[in-house]
C-alpha cells in the first residue's frame, strides 16, 4: 500500500488529479521525492495527450518513484487519507524529467497562459465526442 502524507498543497494537487481523471479514468500518478530543505514531493499525472503534468506538495511519499492509479489518489485526497492504494509501477509510460539542471528560457505572462487555456477549453468542448480532438490539433505548436 503506497501513501502520500501532505503537509501543504493538497487543494492544488486535488484539482490537478481531478482534471487528469476527468480526461482519462485510467490515468496514473507518480511520486518523485525531493529534499530541498524541507521534504517535498513532485506528483506527476498522465494525460491522454502524450504529456504529463505535475504539482509539487510539501510532504513525504512512502516510496520514491511509486506509481498509483490517479483515481485512487483522488479518492484518498478527497477523504483526507494518506494511504493511496496499491502500487502500479508498470503502468507508468516512461522516465520522469530530471530533478534539477533546468534553465529558464522564457517566461509566459499569466494573461497569455489564461488566454491559451480559455481557447483550449473552447476546443475541448467543440470536440467533446468519443473521438475527441484530431491528433494533429493536439500535436500543434502553441508557444514558440
Task: State where each predicted segment sits.
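Generic structural signal for short, solvent-exposed loop/turn connectors between secondary structure elements
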Residues: 1-11, 61-66, 80-84, 144
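N-terminal ordered "arm"
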Residues: 1-58
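Hydrophobic/aromatic-rich structural module bridging two neighboring secondary-structure elements via a short loop
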Residues: 43-87
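Long, compositionally biased intrinsically disordered terminal regions
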Residues: 73-144
Amino acid at each position: 500500500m503506497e501513501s502520500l502524507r501532505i503537509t501543504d498543497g493538497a487543494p492544488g494537487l486535488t484539482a490537478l488529479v481531478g482534471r487528469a481523471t476527468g480526461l482519462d479514468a485510467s490515468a496514473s500518478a507518480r511520486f518523485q521525492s525531493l529534499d530541498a530543505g524541507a521534504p517535498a514531493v513532485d506528483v506527476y499525472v498522465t494525460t491522454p495527450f502524450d504529456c504529463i503534468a505535475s504539482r509539487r506538495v510539501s510532504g513525504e511519499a512512502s516510496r520514491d518513484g511509486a506509481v498509483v492509479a490517479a483515481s485512487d489518489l483522488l479518492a484518498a485526497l478527497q477523504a483526507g487519507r494518506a494511504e493511496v492504494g496499491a502500487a502500479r509501477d508498470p503502468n507508468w509510460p516512461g522516465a520522469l524529467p530530471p530533478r534539477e539542471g533546468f534553465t529558464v528560457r522564457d517566461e509566459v505572462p499569466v494573461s497569455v497562459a489564461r488566454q491559451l487555456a480559455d481557447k483550449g477549453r473552447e476546443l475541448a468542448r467543440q470536440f467533446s465526442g468519443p473521438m475527441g480532438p484530431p491528433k494533429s490539433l493536439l500535436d500543434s505548436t502553441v508557444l514558440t
